Swiss-Prot record:
Protein known as: NADH-quinone oxidoreductase subunit E
GO terms of molecular function: 2 iron, 2 sulfur cluster binding; metal ion binding; NADH dehydrogenase activity; quinone binding
CDD domains from the UniProt entry: TRX_Fd_NuoE
Name of the gene encoding the protein in the UniProt record: nuoE
Known catalytic reactions: a quinone + NADH + 5 H(+)(in) = a quinol + NAD(+) + 4 H(+)(out)
Pfam family, one: 2Fe-2S_thioredx
Length: 167
């Protein structure tokens, strides 16, 4: 996985999509497109945002790089280093912890053979402990890429990993 990216630009399809996104905002408020454009850049780049992608989006929105960087570092949906094909985010905030998220995290570490904030050697999985996913009523909760998995047990988590491993 190339972590030394020195240049970034949207491909033709994403550039058109980015322009359509920006048009949804008034000209004086186009900076408000920062979240969807960073997300678009991250998706184009395999699930993470290198500095050149953040710079590119900031320039496109005519805003200082540092403002775009602040947004990218504030939200856990943005990854500033490479992640696996299946990016597993385990919520460990109090409601999830009370319902066993520590066991879910332990299961993931043991099953994948990695620690928090690591990627498996085959780059199929990455694991990170995060704060609230906003689904406390169904704790413990894990987000894998764009999907939520709720009311988990260690056994259910193992089955999910096995299924993803075989996909």
């Amino acid at each position: 996985m190339n972590t030394k990216i020195t240049n970034f630009s949207f491909d033709k399809k994403n550039l058109s999509l980015a322009e359509d996104i920006i048009k949804k905002y008034p000209p004086e408020g186009k900076r408000s497109a920062i979240l969807p454009l960073l997300d678009l850049a991250q998706r184009q780049n395999g699930g993470w945002l290198p500095v050149p992608a953040i710079e590119y989006v900031a320039n496109m929105l005519e805003m200082p790089y540092m403002r775009a960087y602040e947004v990218a570092t504030f939200y856990t949906m943005f990854n500033l280093k490479p992640v696996g094909k299946n990016h597993i985010q385990v919520c460990t905030t109090t409601p999830c912890w009370l319902r066993g998220s520590d066991d879910i995290m332990k299961t993931c570490k043991e099953k994948l053979g990695i620690k928090d904030e690591e990627v498996t050697k085959d780059q199929k999985f990455s694991l990170i402990e995060i704060e609230c996913l906003g689904a406390c009523v169904n704790a413990p909760v894990v987000q894998i890429n764009d999907d939520y998995y709720e009311d988990l047990t260690p056994e259910k988590m193992e089955a999910i990993i096995d299924k993803l491993r075989n996909d």
